[in-house]
């Protein structure tokens, strides 16, 4: 099998200094330790890792016996994760799908062929939305919220609406503050950042929106200190 195509995101964890040895927790940062502790505490049977990249957290979960679905828009990262999971016999299903397409469904078209003329292909979708197909006990949304809001212009409310449909019980989300180094130093990645100020994009706003769809929330320290792990439960 030929190697996956290369992309700038293939070395994402390495570039951030977060390509840690999964078997050596002593080198992990607060983020990795926190997520591992949450997984061990919640004990989900299934997990959806959105924006998984090459799947560090997907692999972490799969090694704990969890059935994982990992999604990303980067083909190279997903191909790499697929090969790793296959070679190491891990229960990970890597899929190329964007957050925007999580709610997409496809219907058939009318057909004039006599055999199909009386059938209504628009009565039910041929392709169910991911919000129905990929529902999992736990959903990971790490390092993604700020891209969806500040980069793509999705409303925080809409993001939670989609994530609550995907999550049967627990949502683990990483909040990234406007003062985070990557946001400050790479404004070109966040084309809608001018739409937000500190009073419209902050951790309190995110938590309050999340409480509309989840009954409880816990905050956990991440790394660096401009980031916080939010654990929502239904």
Regions picked out by a protein language model, each given a short descriptive name:
Residues 43-53:
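Conserved class I S-adenosyl-L-methionine
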Residues 165-177:
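Conserved beta-strand signature within the Rossmann-like core of class I S-adenosyl-L-methionine
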Residues 54-66:
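Conserved SAM-binding loop of SAM-dependent methyltransferases across substrates and taxa
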Residues 26-43:
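Conserved alpha-helix/loop element of class I SAM-dependent methyltransferases that forms part
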Residues 140:
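A conserved beta-strand element that flanks and buttresses the S-adenosyl-L-methionine
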Residues 116-127, 147-162:
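A short, conserved alpha-helix within the catalytic core of class I
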Residues 67-72:
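Conserved SAM-binding motif I beta-strand of class I
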Residues 82-133:
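S-adenosyl-L-methionine
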